[in-house]
């Protein structure tokens, strides 16, 4: 009560903060006359002057008023848009690294130009992060006009562009990209072998558009770069068939946790089916050796009973594609982990892709915390202000609207069941559409959107459906959703980032209708006509009440509901919003108090009749708060566990960077070898043991394995006065001699390259294995709670021990591989190659690279390429053969392999022996 009185008297903390920023806005406005008086060249020269002032010691904060005035003027001249005072406030908030909550239609994209320009003056790069590629490209093109006018460079990172194009985009003053592209480029960069191959430069400042979507909604989904593992398709199919034989009494479903567990009877039946199919040996399903079978069985249960087609995923082109639960968009390239995706593929009978092993991963929480400064923009962030502050240390500032909001938000309407609700929705849509009022209908899934579409077809109401099936025209459909009488059904926040303009979007109409028309007076007249029609149609829509937003269901998060409401009433336009709910809705069914709702519904409520109750609306909000709190706990837990991996990731990535930047890693490699020898001797010949107790057999075996040395350790053991220190010195001396012999014919710069690549390969290999082990540990660590232990503390302890073990393995691998380096001399000259090899740039480049290195790693005397990589000779032979696949004949060189004596003349007529001509590659293949 006292808080409400204080707020009424003094205003909220947000109001007071906004008031303090208005003084800076006045300074910006004071520069407007002088900046407006500059000609185009003078305005563009401002950038040079600002950078000179920065170099002399001025700060960005000191430059802010004049820089913002410069951007405002450049925007007027290039886009015809002048920043409002409230947009200047938004720019200040972004520059300060805070989150600007701005209502839909208030011009967030334009606001970003202020902070982008100011922070780009330092020349360290600014990243503008968007939720999809369309918005990245659109904003880079539109706002790029302002930046280029002022002499700044603009880049945009799109899928499928080359590394060189990415590198140039990141070198630009301002770079537009999606959160996924940025994150994956970071992971890929940290798998490269030279600095020159990397595409990103050091992070500086980022503005995240739709920050709640990226840092909240996607926070539970880590970015993962993975590689394939063994194919287990038959196992997935067999276990899926077992699950399909189970009945409803065999399992219990927990919809809140999206989990399924077998009952006692279900376990017995599952065991019978698994044994009958030969998947389970004699014994209990939950015996230790059956852990993998239990895991796959659990995933198959979840796939069949918890994940719904056209709700959680859809099947497109014989592939299972995940549907984003918050946006309703398809998430191409994303796959559920831990075998769940494969279980769903088995359920749907589509091709089962192999499981993947994690090569590198990071969450968005930890990726964006790599930036020294980040800021964010969104229409809805206040409900998550606590989370933004606790995890990202960012304050949420609500920016006032330029004009008062005139949208009317009506109370929720409750119906007994889904059928009554959809009938009422269809009737309401028909009535409002008849008056010319445009309607945006929000649904939670493809399934519901298509069900409602059937009801509207039955009522004869023309409409458009926008969901993951029809996503290609998303921006166009949403942009025209404000036309007179338009009815648009959209899943969740499809089209986010595209304004719904009343009367339609003139630019989209011009692009669509005048696509075939060439420049000239006729086209100019058509543009004027379209703009006039749009203005007239807008007035009719305003007279009809503006955009009507109709929600068919409450989302788990109040924020998503607020986003849907926010599509209406932009820039002071009138509007209407209303939600229709029923007892069958997931939120009420899973999280709400159904008993209370059912009692209120049954009180003299006829079929098809609605009830409007503040008590029920409050109960809905309570249910949403419960879900939000649960989801926040999940995200917080994800951060806690990923922070453990993040600390280790930083160490590994910093180590890689140090190795790549070093001219020579010889000292580091020598230190690793010495430590490996010291550990070996300490393990087998402890100082506190008698010589007779030493494990000489293990010492001999490990010296051969790690150092490629066959040592007379038994003779050493029998010497008078021998001790572990002498043993270590002798082993190091022998190892030095071996390496000196191995490297004597290799030029120093090439030996340095060999050492560096060997070290990087070892780091990457063991980091990959370490990630896999941490994944497994993460899945089972919660069981420690049953032993009265704190899972996160146990995870930290064990992860640290595993990390130390990994560092030792890296050290041993580097020592082992460098001890086996051998010089490999090719049996041919490049000039002697046959023509069909010379015509392949890939083969020639590979062979030239081999000529430079002239070495190959061997193990136990057998040439074996590491990590399943083919040797250069094999690659040349394979590519040469592949190039000839379409035209093989007896006269073809590819048919001569194995049929001609190596010392016989080559059939090609060169006059050389076969082994020095076309047979040069037969020796290896």
From Swiss-Prot:
Any one GO molecular function term: metal ion binding
GO biological process entries: intracellular protein transmembrane transport; protein import; protein targeting; protein transport by the Sec complex
Pfam families named in the record: P-loop_SecA, SEC-C, SecA_DEAD, SecA_PP_bind, SecA_SW
Catalysed reactions, semicolon-separated: ATP + H2O + cellular proteinSide 1 = ADP + phosphate + cellular proteinSide 2
GO cellular component: cell envelope Sec protein transport complex; cytosol; plasma membrane
Keywords from the UniProt entry: ATP-binding, Cell inner membrane, Cell membrane, Cytoplasm, Membrane, Metal-binding, Nucleotide-binding, Protein transport, Translocase, Translocation, Transport, Zinc
Subcellular location per the Swiss-Prot or TrEMBL entry: Cell inner membrane; Cytoplasm
CDD domains: DEXDc_SecA, SF2_C_secA
Record's function text: Part of the Sec protein translocase complex. Interacts with the SecYEG preprotein conducting channel. Has a central role in coupling the hydrolysis of ATP to the transfer of proteins into and across the cell membrane, serving both as a receptor for the preprotein-SecB complex and as an ATP-driven molecular motor driving the stepwise translocation of polypeptide chains across the membrane.
Cofactor(s) needed for function: Zn(2+)
UniProt-listed PROSITE patterns: SECA (PS01312), SECA_MOTOR_DEAD (PS51196)
TM ranges: none
Annotated protein name in UniProt: Protein translocase subunit SecA
Lineage of producing organism: Bacteria, Pseudomonadati, Pseudomonadota, Alphaproteobacteria, Sphingomonadales
Major subcellular location class: membrane
Cited Gene3D superfamilies: 3.10.450.50, Helical scaffold and wing domains of SecA, P-loop containing nucleotide triphosphate hydrolases, SecA, preprotein cross-linking domain
The gene coding this protein: secA
Record-annotated disulphide pairs: none
Domain of life: Bacteria
Keyword Endoplasmic reticulum: no
Subunit structure: Monomer and homodimer. Part of the essential Sec protein translocation apparatus which comprises SecA, SecYEG and auxiliary proteins SecDF-YajC and YidC.
Record: residues binding ATP: 87, 105-109, 499
Membrane topology qualifier: Peripheral membrane protein
UniProt remark on cofactor binding: May bind 1 zinc ion per subunit.
Binding sites annotated in the UniProt record for Zn(2+): 906, 908, 917-918
């Amino acid at each position: 009560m006292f808080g409400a009185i204080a707020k009424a008297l003094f205003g909220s903390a947000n109001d007071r903060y906004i008031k303090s920023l208005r003084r800076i806005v006045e300074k910006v406005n004071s520069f407007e006359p002088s900046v407006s008086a500059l000609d185009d060249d003078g305005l563009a020269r401002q950038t040079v002057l600002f950078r000179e002032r920065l170099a002399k010691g001025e700060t960005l904060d000191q430059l802010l008023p004049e820089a913002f005035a410069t951007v405002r003027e450049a925007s007027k001249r290039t886009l015809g848009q002048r920043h409002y005072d409230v947009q200047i406030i938004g720019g200040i908030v972004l520059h300060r690294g805070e989150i600007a909550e701005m209502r839909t239609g208030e011009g967030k994209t334009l606001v970003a130009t202020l902070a982008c320009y100011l922070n780009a003056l330092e020349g360290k790069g600014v990243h503008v992060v968007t939720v999809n590629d369309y918005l990245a490209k659109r904003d880079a093109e539109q706002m790029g006009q302002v930046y280029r006018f002022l002499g700044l460079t603009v880049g945009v990172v799109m899928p499928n562009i080359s590394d060189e194009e990415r590198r140039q985009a990141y070198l630009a003053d301002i770079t537009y990209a999606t959160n996924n592209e940025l994150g994956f480029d970071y992971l890929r960069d940290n798998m490269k072998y030279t600095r020159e191959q990397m595409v990103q430069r050091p992070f500086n400042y980022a503005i995240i558009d739709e920050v709640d979507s990226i840092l909240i909604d996607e926070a539970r989904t880590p970015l993962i770069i993975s590689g394939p593992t063994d194919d287990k398709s038959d196992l997935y199919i067999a276990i899926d068939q077992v699950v399909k034989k189970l009945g409803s009494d065999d399992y219990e479903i927990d919809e809140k946790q999206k989990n399924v567990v077998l009952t006692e009877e279900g376990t017995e039946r599952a065991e019978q089916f698994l044994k009958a199919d030969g998947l389970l040996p004699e014994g209990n399903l939950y015996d230790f050796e059956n852990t993998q079978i239990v895991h796959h069985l659990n995933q198959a249960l979840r796939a069949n009973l918890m994940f719904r087609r056209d709700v959680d995923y859809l099947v497109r082109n014989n592939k299972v594609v995940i549907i984003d639960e918050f946006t309703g968009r398809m998430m191409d390239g994303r796959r559920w982990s831990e075998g769940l995706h494969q279980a769903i593929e088995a359920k749907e009978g589509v091709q089962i892709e192999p499981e993947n092993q994690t090569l590198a991963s990071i969450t968005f929480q930890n990726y964006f915390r790599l930036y020294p400064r980040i800021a964010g923009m969104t229409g809805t962030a206040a409900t998550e202000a606590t989370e933004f502050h606790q995890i990202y240390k960012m304050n949420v500032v609500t920016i006032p609207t330029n004009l008062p909001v005139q949208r009317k938000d009506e109370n929720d309407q409750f119906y007994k069941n889904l059928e009554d609700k959809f009938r009422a929705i269809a009737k309401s849509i028909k009535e409002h559409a008849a008056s010319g009022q445009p309607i945006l209908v929000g649904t939670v899934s493809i399934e519901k959107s298509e069900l409602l579409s059937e009801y509207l077809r039955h009522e004869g109401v023309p409409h458009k459906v926008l969901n993951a099936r029809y996503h290609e025209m998303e921006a166009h459909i949403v942009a025209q959703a404000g036309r007179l009488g338009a009815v648009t059904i959209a899943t969740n926040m499809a089209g986010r980032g595209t304004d719904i303009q009343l009367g339609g979007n003139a630019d989209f109409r011009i692009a669509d209708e005048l696509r075939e028309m060439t420049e000239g007076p006729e086209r100019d007249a058509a543009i004027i006509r379209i703009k006039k029609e749009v203005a007239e149609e807008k007035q009719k829509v305003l007279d009809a009440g503006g955009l009507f937003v109709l929600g068919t269901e409450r989302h788990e998060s109040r924020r998503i509901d607020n986003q849907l409401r926010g599509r209406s009433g932009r820039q002071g336009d009138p509007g209407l919003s209303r939600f229709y709910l029923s007892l069958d809705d997931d939120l009420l069914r899973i999280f709400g108090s159904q008993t209370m709702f059912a009692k209120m519904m049954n009180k003299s409520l006829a079929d098809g009749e609605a009830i409007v109750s503040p008590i029920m609306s409050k109960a809905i909000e309570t249910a949403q708060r419960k879900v939000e709190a649960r989801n926040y706990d999940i995200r917080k837990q994800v951060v806690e566990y990923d922070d453990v991996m993040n600390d280790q990731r930083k160490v590994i990535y910093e180590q890689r960077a140090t190795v790549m930047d070093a001219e020579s890693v010889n000292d580091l490699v020598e230190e690793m070898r010495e430590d490996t020898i010291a550990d070996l001797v300490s393990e087998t010949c402890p100082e506190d043991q008698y010589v007779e107790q030493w494990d000489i057999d293990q010492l001999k075996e490990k010296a051969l394995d790690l150092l490629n040395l066959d040592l007379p350790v038994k003779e050493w053991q029998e010497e008078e006065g021998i001790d572990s220190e002498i043993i270590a010195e002798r082993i190091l001396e022998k190892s030095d001699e071996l390496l000196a012999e191995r490297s004597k014919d290799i030029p120093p710069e090439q030996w340095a390259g060999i050492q560096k690549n060997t070290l990087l390969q070892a780091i990457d290999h063991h980091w990959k294995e370490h990630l896999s082990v941490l994944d497994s540990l993460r899945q089972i660590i919660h069981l420690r709670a049953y032993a009265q232990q704190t899972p996160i503390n146990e995870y930290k302890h064990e992860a640290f021990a595993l990390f130390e073990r990994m560092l030792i393995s890296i050290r041993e691998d580097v020592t082992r591989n460098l001890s086996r380096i051998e010089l490999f001399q090719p049996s041919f000259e490049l000039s002697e190659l046959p023509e069909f090899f010379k015509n392949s740039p890939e083969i020639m480049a590979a062979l030239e690279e081999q000529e430079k290195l002239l070495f190959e790693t061997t193990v136990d005397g057998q040439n074996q390429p590491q990590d399943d990589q083919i040797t250069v000779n094999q690659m040349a032979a394979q590519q040469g053969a592949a190039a000839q696949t379409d035209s093989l004949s007896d006269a073809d060189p590819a048919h001569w392999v194995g049929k001609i004596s190596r010392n016989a003349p080559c059939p090609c007529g060169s006059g050389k022996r076969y082994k020095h001509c076309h047979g040069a590659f037969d020796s290896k293949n």
